[in-house]
Amino acid sequence: MIPVRCFTCGKVIAGSWEEYKRRTGEGEDPATVLDDLKFVRYCCRRMFLAHVELVDTMAPYQ
């Protein structure tokens, strides 16, 4: 679960997560994808690049 907004600037980022994940999964360069999605601030880019999906890993322990 990616946060809805960037922690630093507050820009809404969650709506672009699925497209980012799909395009990078197809082998496209993450920097190019973020440029196309209009994420130019490094704080927002960090949210995408540093995010790790742990929901599926932690779900069995609930």
UniProtKB/Swiss-Prot annotation:
It is found in: Cytoplasm. Its EC number is 2.7.7.6. Its main location: cytoplasm. It catalyses: RNA(n) + a ribonucleoside 5'-triphosphate = RNA(n+1) + diphosphate. Keywords: Cytoplasm, DNA-directed RNA polymerase, Metal-binding, Nucleotidyltransferase, Transcription, Transferase, Zinc. GO terms for cellular component: cytoplasm; DNA-directed RNA polymerase complex. One of its GO terms (biological process) is DNA-templated transcription. GO terms for molecular function: DNA binding; DNA-directed RNA polymerase activity; zinc ion binding. The keyword Metal-binding applies. Binds 1 zinc ion. The keyword Lyase does not apply. Zn(2+) binds at C6, C9, C43, C44. Its cofactor is Zn(2+). InterPro entries: RNA_pol_su_RPB10, RNA_pol_suN_Zn-BS, RPABC5/Rpb10. DNA-dependent RNA polymerase (RNAP) catalyzes the transcription of DNA into RNA using the four ribonucleoside triphosphates as substrates. Part of the RNA polymerase complex. HAMAP family: RNApol_arch_Rpo10. Belongs to the archaeal Rpo10/eukaryotic RPB10 RNA polymerase subunit family. This is DNA-directed RNA polymerase subunit Rpo10. It comes from Methanococcoides burtonii (strain DSM 6242 / NBRC 107633 / OCM 468 / ACE-M).
